[in-house]
Amino acid sequence: VIDSTHARMSEVFHPDGGSWKRSDMPRTSFVFLNAEEGLSPEEQSRAAHREAKAALGAYWNALEGTIDPSKVENAAQNALIGNAEEIAQQIVERFHPEDRIMAWFDFFNHDSERVCRDMTAYMEQVAPRVENILTGA
């Protein structure tokens, strides 16, 4: 669906806007990153999965009034969840190298200091790792 949308947009995009680029249509993804100090990569991963499950469960509960485990599981499959290395791998596996990702870090997380740490870890650990994987460095 996404590739066909890009193909269609490249044909109909107004010339005044320049040529269509994949980055013109950001891909939205919830990010449940745990890069907290004092935890092993395995502990970070487990904590990120717990945090994602709780947040996504609350999301579906708020939308529909009941928690449907299959919907929580499906939403979790679309989110980026884990420690920095896991999220870098998920980005490379799921997204085209020219995609622009609109990452949501604060989804149901009201701890602004933690959200800031997560965003910093994403830019300092995840983004460079993705670049290294894509360039073979």
Give, region by region, the residue ranges found by the protein language model.
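Glycine-rich, proline-tolerant flexible connector loops at the mouths of alpha/beta enzymes
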Residues: 104-115
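Alpha-helix-loop-beta-strand connector modules within alpha/beta enzyme cores
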Residues: 120-134
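Conserved strand-to-helix beginnings and helix N-cap segments that scaffold or border functional pockets
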Residues: 2-3, 113-119
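A generic structural signal for solvent-exposed, polar alpha-helical segments
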Residues: 65-66, 110, 127-128
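An alpha-helical appendage that flanks or caps ligand/catalytic pockets
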Residues: 1-99, 131-137
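Short, electropositive alpha-helical surface patch
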Residues: 49-50, 116-124
